[in-house]
């Protein structure tokens, strides 16, 4: 209890005693009245009342323009404007408005996407003496039209992009589109000749703007505020919130909410800069937009603030929160990083009536100090009666900020403000009374017990609610529902919180009149609907989606036998909310099923299956025989779990059956009883080839693993996935290797180590290595002793570095861990390193569950292991899969999205975007969201590439195979397949998606053939498998609740949530574009990892917007045709045209060849070494420039003769080429002649290639490249291995880089001479062949301090280069600052010594970055003394604000390459 509360209660106690002694018959209610002292205290909190401010905000903006004409006023995504431009452009537009219609006080709607021109339009209307109504184009057209009709708009100002929409919603108005071109004349030489009109003086009493909110009549309610009413609140409010002349203010709020008016006018009136991101970035990349625009002040709801990256807060001077309650934990957390402000204010009393500018100062949140007003608390049932401090009352706002008029329609305006009640006119014993306007807010609050007069929010009194930050009048929803239902229907809309937790939900309670008053025999309050009423509900739901925003459409319709009523005969809403808390989310799903006919399961299998559905989806009795598994919340992940649940129940069901028969009745017909036979055992060495005996297999694989032959426990083939992953690791050393670290108490770490070893004994995959057996291919070898522990260490950074450098290669352990304990520490760093060839996202939790159980002394028994899956793969007839893929990919379109910048380009992802796609809660679809995403992406690709035939890759779980117990197999089973989709724009969307779904099911038996095997089937297959886009879908995992991490420490190594798991998948991206979609109950998050050289970031942002639009269209109107949604806007179409191959654009009339076309292959193809030598010799012999000699020319076409042929053979021999005159005569081209030149190394490679690729040597010549012949990563590894056996030393990288067999043979080294081993740790070694180019003198010239001593130089990676540029260039987005507060004084000299020692001991902290031509290099220094500054905080300064100011100075200071 606070001191103020104690004193108040003591005074109340004394007054009650006095009253009892003086009048024992007094009523108890009399003690609830405000005492004289309390009334005096209330008046002291509300006195004096700020006088009305009699000027207009646009006058303040004009003053700023006069003071700072060239200062940037608006920094927007679509351009910048100076204060001079804002002033001149708004004046020019105001004169235009006057010329078109000179009447004062008319209301002019304003319709813009987020843009620099919105502020100009608003100021122009203010200067013209009119009243503006801001609209958001994202709102439904029906709502926009209702607003425009209310204001009887004659003029309508819009952006150029929204002019068409403006014309639709206001057909009778004159549309004035605003864009840059409109103001070209303002600074032109003929500007003086333009017609002008004198702008009228604007009175502070004139209307400034009208703000629309939910209305109880079903129409939006309009509230008009005058200039003086707004200014009287904005001026004191802006100072408290934190608007300063140096502020860079985020323009975040939707134009539908009045907060955006403050963002514009308060910013410009204070000489600050308004930062306006695009709508797309505002919704999908707010943190990135704020970084790019260097925002220092932002206003938003707490829900949005929680989505910001942590470092964003560090760069803000203030963050203003409003629109919904702020939690104490959020306030405390954010308050450590920036100044947190809490604002409250209904539209009827301007944007903010109270401001708490020190939110983090208390363990609870108040609404803050009054600004431009007084605040009173009255009895909710009697507005004339004040409540005493501490009691809950309705908040009333008094003062000049209270609006005068409300509900503006074509009829007479209605006054809504109240006069101060007579009981208040007299004031108190210390304060005189007064007259004024008052607004009843409907909010229930109480005063802060500290006695400072600040209110604390308690709740809402009326039907106005807040849901996810949106202000909703329930009556508006009820009105719109009632229009489409029978007139005698009783209904009430409420926000409930269903039992079982989770988010609040908007629902509608309904009583069908024919059943009113009936009651179920068991007393159940829930009723039912007749068939006719259900039909009416279906039609109403469709109409609500047109009339109302999505957040105002109920998510469920709950039938009641009788509507609960109060004594007053009003709806008992409290009782409805109580009923809502008894409803589960399964109940809501059941209530929502009224739109479909219910049929009870009847057969034994249907009843059993319903039980399984219930366990998996919740609510066993909810499901009818015609319910669709996917409509009820099922997806591919739950389909696999259903298979497992069925097996536990003694039933056999497989995933394809579920996908093809999604209704409960159809699915039940596919179920079979599980046979009694136990799972067949798979003996060791039983899966290898028959001509490879066990002893030979053990001996060969043991040698390749470097272990004793007795250590080999089993050998079996690799999956195609494993082969591909190992091949990519050979190309990129750290590809597909994950490294994770957990810091644990040393005792826990030691127990966990023992648990790992125990788990390895029972899990063969942890003891598995992969080897390449010459002549046989890749095999996995299971060892008896996995030896997972790599080593101990004392320096975490050093261990991690060395661990990364130790490649996970053929023959090495693919899962290992290390323990690192620093000296004197009682904690241990537990590091695990694992290769994707032994785990995937499904098996990883299984492995760590085994480890956790071992940690707790429990055994784990699994009925199947990875080799059971291998047995299944080896039992398949490969011919069936080959026929399927050969037919599936026949005639495929060779152009894929996104295109490569040039032929042979190797992609490397360097950019990442995220975009959330909301799925309407009212959308019911009988297909999975995964199918919709596949179909939508296929249409997006088709639109951009201009072709109805598209291909992209998809990575699947691979656990749809018919293997008993497949869901508990510990091992990687994911697989990637080419998804080919052919589109017809005349086809209905529902039919198209059904075809995509059917294709997905049909490919299940063939999905494990492997990309490297599919590509060898045909030329078309090879083209299709050169995948540019990879798609990964992450279904939402069920929430298992809180877990005791001390009992399951291995879970520390698992991704924290679905989003983190998705981000981990992105680390393994080898595509030009990888899309990872994380699905949840409200939609899905797209994470796009891409190579910006293939598609720019801006273009990719627009692609994701197109994807969002198409998914929404698919769900919103599945019966429309594909062509109806296959539309690109002008900017998107421009992107598509730039990407599209020229010969695909048949309507363009351009006949040039595509960049990838075979017509240009010969011209673009690099010459082989033999061709280069022939060209040089022929140029000499024939006396012609080499540039005129083409590989397609023959010797005689170039003018050669027999003598020339003899000279050619002779000169060729001098250059090491073995050639005969007969070959010269027989060759039809120089390319063919060069290919016919033989050498021993090339012949060896020819033999190997013929064997690996399975094609005759006669079909291979020296000008062919390995990949043109159908080679892939796996083949490259086999080629290197077999070449080494033939005495040729090659690397996988050389195979990838060589353009022809001849070039590859030239680069191969004979292994007769001993190989010299290079020291990879030597200085400059990381630069490879370029090391000689970078001498210390050359690098030293770039350093800021020439005295620094260079230790090493290394190249940087693309993302590292991006971070460096983000430090050197403005705006800076790669800097990080940490503010550490010490509780007690410290030795400052020792602190500096410690900082310098930290730098000296860590190589990365001693690294600076220089730029040599276009390359960014990391330069490791010996022991530089880094800058260290001590800055004293002036007396009276706030240390946080002072620190932020110094941080901002440092951000703006130059940071050139070569500096520390």
From Swiss-Prot:
What the record says about its domains?
A: NRP synthetases are composed of discrete domains (adenylation (A), thiolation (T) or peptidyl carrier protein (PCP) and condensation (C) domains) which when grouped together are referred to as a single module. Each module is responsible for the recognition (via the A domain) and incorporation of a single amino acid into the growing peptide product. Thus, an NRP synthetase is generally composed of one or more modules and can terminate in a thioesterase domain (TE) that releases the newly synthesized peptide from the enzyme.
Q: What induces it?
A: Expression is up-regulated under iron depletion.
Reported phenotype of the disruption mutant: Leads to increased sensitivity to oxidative stress and raduces the virulence toward Arabidopsis thaliana plants.
Alphabetized InterPro entries for the sequence: ACP-like_sf (IPR036736), AMP-bd_C_sf (IPR045851), AMP-binding_CS (IPR020845), AMP-dep_synth/lig_dom (IPR000873), ANL_N_sf (IPR042099), CAT-like_dom_sf (IPR023213), Condensatn (IPR001242), PKS_PP-bd (IPR020806)
List the residue ranges of the region (Disordered). Answer: 1303-1324
**Quick one: a GO cellular component term?**
cytoplasm
Q: Which PANTHER family match?
A: NONRIBOSOMAL PEPTIDE SYNTHASE ATNA-RELATED, NONRIBOSOMAL PEPTIDE SYNTHETASE
Q: What is this protein's record name?
A: Nonribosomal peptide synthetase 6
Q: What family is this protein classified in? A: Belongs to the NRP synthetase family.
O-(pantetheine 4'-phosphoryl)serine modified-residue sites = 636, 1202, 1273
- Pathway, per UniProt? Siderophore biosynthesis
Q: Which Pfam families match?
A: AMP-binding, Condensation, PP-binding
EC numbers on record: 6.3.2.-
User: Keywords of this protein's UniProt record, alphabetized?
Assistant: Ligase, Multifunctional enzyme, Phosphopantetheine, Phosphoprotein
Please give a single GO biological process term from the UniProt record: secondary metabolite biosynthetic process
